[in-house]
Amino acid sequence: MSFDGFTDATEAQVTRAISDSWMEEFRERTDTEVIVVGGGPSGLVAAKELAERGVDVTIVEKNNYLGGGFWLGGFLMNKVTVRDPAQRVLDELGVPYEESDEAEGLYVADGPHACSALIKAACDAGAKIQNMTEFTDVVLREDDRVGGIVMNWTPVHALPRELTCVDPIAVESDLVLDATGHDAVVLSKLSERGVLDVNGIEHAKEHNTGMDKTADGEYGAPGHDSPGHDSMWVSESEDSIVDATGVVHPGVVASGMAVATAHHLPRMGPTFGAMLLSGRQAAQSCLDELGRDAPDVSISGPAPADD
């Protein structure tokens, strides 16, 4: 088998191809229907469901990678669990899984397979991604309705103040989905601005020094404990999070662990069914808020067809 070589392209042509394509897409995304802040499992599911129904949706993710904690289960083990009926999302994604001997309706899948399949599904549906981009503030309108977000490149945050002063930019949207996990950064900013009382954050202020932080006052990595939500209780947590997913402030919907912080609900640890189904519930909430004439999102999904 012979190889005839690649086609010719200069370095400048490669650079222009990248920058022109990125800028064209970015300009289109400065005013969109839904901005999903956080590209973890709940945010990806919500973006996928919305994009499949023709909603213009952009995911803003502060890391270089998507997926949040969905790549791994607990304790650096790369197996993830879901409980019935969330395995139907894995069926839809084509991700294999096995039922555990530990409990009926408890399923185990490979984290990298499940996470990469979900990322692909969101991209294939038409969701656009702005990664390495950090949420820094909200755009407010009349009556404190949120009308978009303020954002900056993630590396800017890591630079010492003496070395840089880089203003952020703002993008507008009809809705913002806080899918940022334990820290609930969109809700935290609204609380900081004094326009929203967030149960979990108020509890943290009363009983702790504040939201979970590491050195130098920075937020901890995804998966760290947070006084914004309650302690671990798998069965109570997952049901409660899906039930409480929805609008939390005019222009803002919350999903996933951000819901636990919003309502001071228990955490569920390394099981992901609530993240997946909360994403679906959040997508339906967004459709309702937008008034879109689109097929409803089935929260638990149709039962798999019989063989």
Swiss-Prot record:
Catalytic activity: [ADP-thiazole synthase]-L-cysteine + glycine + NAD(+) = [ADP-thiazole synthase]-dehydroalanine + ADP-5-ethyl-4-methylthiazole-2-carboxylate + nicotinamide + 3 H2O + 2 H(+)
Keywords, comma-separated and alphabetical: Iron, Metal-binding, NAD, Thiamine biosynthesis, Transferase
Source species, domain of life: Archaea
Enzyme class: transferase
Sites where the protein binds NAD(+): S42, E61, K62, G69, D167, M257
Effect of a null allele: Cells lacking this gene are auxotrophic for thiamine. The mutants thiamine requirement can be overcome by adding thiazole moiety 4-methyl-5-(beta-hydroxyethyl)thiazole (THZ) to the growth medium.
Residues holding glycine: R267
Free-text description of this protein's post-translational modifications in UniProt: During the catalytic reaction, a sulfide is transferred from Cys-165 to a reaction intermediate, generating a dehydroalanine residue.
PANTHER family documented for this protein: THIAMINE THIAZOLE SYNTHASE (PTHR43422:SF3)
Subunit annotation: Homooctamer; tetramer of dimers.
Protein name: Thiamine thiazole synthase
Organism: Haloferax volcanii (strain ATCC 29605 / DSM 3757 / JCM 8879 / NBRC 14742 / NCIMB 2012 / VKM B-1768 / DS2)
Encoding gene, per UniProt annotation: thi4
